[in-house]
Amino acid sequence: MPRTADDSWDIATSVGATAVMVALARAAETASETPLIRDQFAEPLVSTPELAAVREQVAAWWAQTDDDDDPDFTVDSQQMTDYLAVRTHFFDSYFIDAVAAGIRQVVILAAGLDSRAYRLDWPGGTMVYEIDLPKVLDYKEHTLARHGAAPVAALRAVPVDLRHDWPQALRDAGFQTSLPTAWLAEGLLPFLPAAAQHALFTAIDANSATGSRVAVEMFGVDEDARRAAEERAQRWARQRAKRQARGQDTSFDPFDLWFDDEGQPDPADWFAAHGWTTDSVQVGAEALRLGRTATSQEGPFVNRFVTAGKP
């Protein structure tokens, strides 16, 4: 279903279902022989009866079959599990470094089924704010409570749409603009239109004290990247049509939910232009550093992880 400017969802629909996909990958990685990450909460979060249909839809999207005539392009479960394991490991390390430097205020934007408040070794006095839609946050809180899980850090849910006045909602929840903050925008940007991305970065900057940090998963926004994305979209459309003709389920596809309007900011350039010290890591290089072969240089491994600090 096409996105609209003010659409909404729960954990089993639209953008919410993509959080299920991510948690499924974290669960698979955790259960593997040599996991990069350990997320013991991912499996219980995705194993509930109400997510049965989503699990089937994601499995169909991930399936790699001999009938696919463009195998180098096909998304498969191992590729996505590897990518999301590398991504999770990188941003886990980002938070570990941030609190080691003395930061005790954390904001996770579009938190979805993120369980870092429950599984990372947070120092005493750390406050974690999770922002997402109310139904998504409610599902996570109630599911983990049924399993007896308790957050390691102090945790405050901020139920608000990131296209609305989320900074005010964050401050109303107790966020202190005078304290340095570690911000995270993981897997978020494509689900926001360009104007909302600019507004997001502006709000982060305006609400960040000296010593704050931000980490962003960066998807291609330059002209070459946009052309490559358009080519991938055309290839996937052809592949998808053939799957549909064979009677396969193609109802789940995160790319259906992405905004592709022009003017999306490059986070590294944006924060550098606003006085932050920035760095970026190409995901394929990070995967190789961690011993994971980047299975496709055309897939998500071409993304970048951007980090920045406010002097």
Swiss-Prot record:
The Swiss-Prot or TrEMBL record describes its family as follows:
Belongs to the UPF0677 family.
Q: Which GO terms describe its molecular function?
A: methyltransferase activity
Q: What does this protein do?
A: Exhibits S-adenosyl-L-methionine-dependent methyltransferase activity.
Residue numbers binding S-adenosyl-L-methionine: 132, 161-162
Q: What is this protein called?
A: Putative S-adenosyl-L-methionine-dependent methyltransferase MUL_4761
Q: What is its EC number?
A: 2.1.1.-
**Keyword vocabulary terms for this entry:** Methyltransferase, S-adenosyl-L-methionine, Transferase
Q: Which Pfam families match?
A: LCM
InterPro entries the UniProt entry points to: Ppm1/Ppm2/Tcmp (IPR007213), SAM-dependent_MTases_sf (IPR029063), SAM_mthyl_Trfase_ML2640-like (IPR011610)
Quick one: a GO biological-process term for this protein? methylation
Going by the record, the broad EC class of this enzyme is: transferase
